[in-house]
Amino acid sequence: MATRRLTDAFLLLRNNSIQNRQLLAEQVSSHITSSPLHSRSIAAELDELADDRMALVSGISLDPEAAIGVTKRPPPKWVDGVDEIQYDVGRIKQKMKELASLHDKHLNRPTLDDSSEEEHAIEITTQEITQLFHRCQRAVQALPSRARACSEQEGRLLGNVVASLAQALQELSTSFRHAQSGYLKRMKNREERSQHFFDTSVPLMDDGDDNTLYHRGFTEDQLVLVEQNTLMVEEREREIRQIVQSISDLNEIFRDLGAMIVEQGTVLDRIDYNVEQSCIKTEDGLKQLHKAEQYQKKNRKMLVILILFVIIIVLIVVLVGVKSR
């Protein structure tokens, strides 16, 4: 199902309407103070300009419909929720850029020194992105509950907005999951390379066999390096487990968003089905109307024949009465 993202255009038009509203209010107030005798005519003109179709069809630059729209029809309650979700989506994109730079910096270090600060920053950023995804998911699911008393048009608009937000979150979660999978693969490749360079055929021994290991050619510095590499491998395994956990969380979010999109598509299919059924019923009603019209015409002919028959009988009775006298 092809969709278009109209959220940015909606926000731009809404901001322009607020500015135009202020300009029109200033002009109207100055005009009323300068000529109070014409206040009633100005109010009548504003009432005429309040119509949505007039505001859309006419080429008015000041958008007077928005000038009185606040007093008559405030924006729906779910608009604030949409703004919050869009703000969180922007934060997710920014955090994903920061996480990508941290991944590159952590994997492309020229030295073998372990940097716990970078790993801690990666962990915190990943957790923040996951929390933002969960919060956006809950906010998108809670949007329909804010539109219980809205009109049919606002309900359709809200359905399109929810579908658009769900699709945007699904795309972001997909890209984030691919980024995490790529980082995990690069980590595994680096571990394989490190094991290839640092692996030895000599088995690790207990503390009592250190002298034997020393006589085989290992120095104390090499033993310390082996211990450091062991600690580094354990740390990498912990990072890999965290990445796998974040990917599993993203899979849950991805499934929920996919279910929401499928649900919205089912609603749209149901609407299409109802429209088709209404068209079919309208055509059937039109056929029945034509049949009723034909029956009505036949009834008129029968009524005329019946009236003529009654007139003939009356005339015959009158004629018989006249002749009998």
From Swiss-Prot:
<dbReference type="GO" id="GO:0005794">
    <property type="term" value="C:Golgi apparatus"/>
</dbReference>
<dbReference type="GO" id="GO:0032456">
    <property type="term" value="P:endocytic recycling"/>
</dbReference>
<dbReference type="GO" id="GO:0016020">
    <property type="term" value="C:membrane"/>
</dbReference>
<dbReference type="GO" id="GO:0031985">
    <property type="term" value="C:Golgi cisterna"/>
</dbReference>
<keyword id="KW-0333">Golgi apparatus</keyword>
<feature type="topological domain" description="Vesicular">
    <location>
        <begin position="323"/>
        <end position="325"/>
    </location>
</feature>
<dbReference type="GO" id="GO:0005925">
    <property type="term" value="C:focal adhesion"/>
</dbReference>
<dbReference type="GO" id="GO:0005484">
    <property type="term" value="F:SNAP receptor activity"/>
</dbReference>
<dbReference type="InterPro" id="IPR045242">
    <property type="entry name" value="Syntaxin"/>
</dbReference>
<keyword id="KW-0812">Transmembrane</keyword>
<feature type="domain" description="t-SNARE coiled-coil homology">
    <location>
        <begin position="230"/>
        <end position="292"/>
    </location>
</feature>
<keyword id="KW-0175">Coiled coil</keyword>
<comment type="subunit">
    <text>Interacts with GCC2. Interacts with BAIAP3; this interaction is increased in the presence of calcium.</text>
</comment>
<protein>
    <recommendedName>
        <fullName>Syntaxin-16</fullName>
    </recommendedName>
</protein>
<dbReference type="GO" id="GO:0019905">
    <property type="term" value="F:syntaxin binding"/>
</dbReference>
<comment type="function">
    <text>SNARE involved in vesicular transport from the late endosomes to the trans-Golgi network.</text>
</comment>
<feature type="transmembrane region" description="Helical; Anchor for type IV membrane protein">
    <location>
        <begin position="302"/>
        <end position="322"/>
    </location>
</feature>
<dbReference type="GO" id="GO:0032588">
    <property type="term" value="C:trans-Golgi network membrane"/>
</dbReference>
<dbReference type="GO" id="GO:0042147">
    <property type="term" value="P:retrograde transport, endosome to Golgi"/>
</dbReference>
<keyword id="KW-0813">Transport</keyword>
<dbReference type="GO" id="GO:0012505">
    <property type="term" value="C:endomembrane system"/>
</dbReference>
<dbReference type="GO" id="GO:0000139">
    <property type="term" value="C:Golgi membrane"/>
</dbReference>
<dbReference type="GO" id="GO:0031201">
    <property type="term" value="C:SNARE complex"/>
</dbReference>
<dbReference type="GO" id="GO:0030672">
    <property type="term" value="C:synaptic vesicle membrane"/>
</dbReference>
<dbReference type="GO" id="GO:0048471">
    <property type="term" value="C:perinuclear region of cytoplasm"/>
</dbReference>
<dbReference type="GO" id="GO:0005829">
    <property type="term" value="C:cytosol"/>
</dbReference>
<keyword id="KW-0597">Phosphoprotein</keyword>
<keyword id="KW-0963">Cytoplasm</keyword>
<dbReference type="GO" id="GO:0006886">
    <property type="term" value="P:intracellular protein transport"/>
</dbReference>
<dbReference type="GO" id="GO:0005737">
    <property type="term" value="C:cytoplasm"/>
</dbReference>
<feature type="modified residue" description="Phosphoserine">
    <location>
        <position position="41"/>
    </location>
</feature>
<dbReference type="InterPro" id="IPR000727">
    <property type="entry name" value="T_SNARE_dom"/>
</dbReference>
<dbReference type="InterPro" id="IPR010989">
    <property type="entry name" value="SNARE"/>
</dbReference>
<comment type="similarity">
    <text>Belongs to the syntaxin family.</text>
</comment>
<keyword id="KW-1133">Transmembrane helix</keyword>
<dbReference type="GO" id="GO:0048278">
    <property type="term" value="P:vesicle docking"/>
</dbReference>
<keyword id="KW-0472">Membrane</keyword>
<feature type="topological domain" description="Cytoplasmic">
    <location>
        <begin position="1"/>
        <end position="301"/>
    </location>
</feature>
<dbReference type="InterPro" id="IPR006012">
    <property type="entry name" value="Syntaxin/epimorphin_CS"/>
</dbReference>
<keyword id="KW-0653">Protein transport</keyword>
<dbReference type="GO" id="GO:0000149">
    <property type="term" value="F:SNARE binding"/>
</dbReference>
<dbReference type="GO" id="GO:0043231">
    <property type="term" value="C:intracellular membrane-bounded organelle"/>
</dbReference>
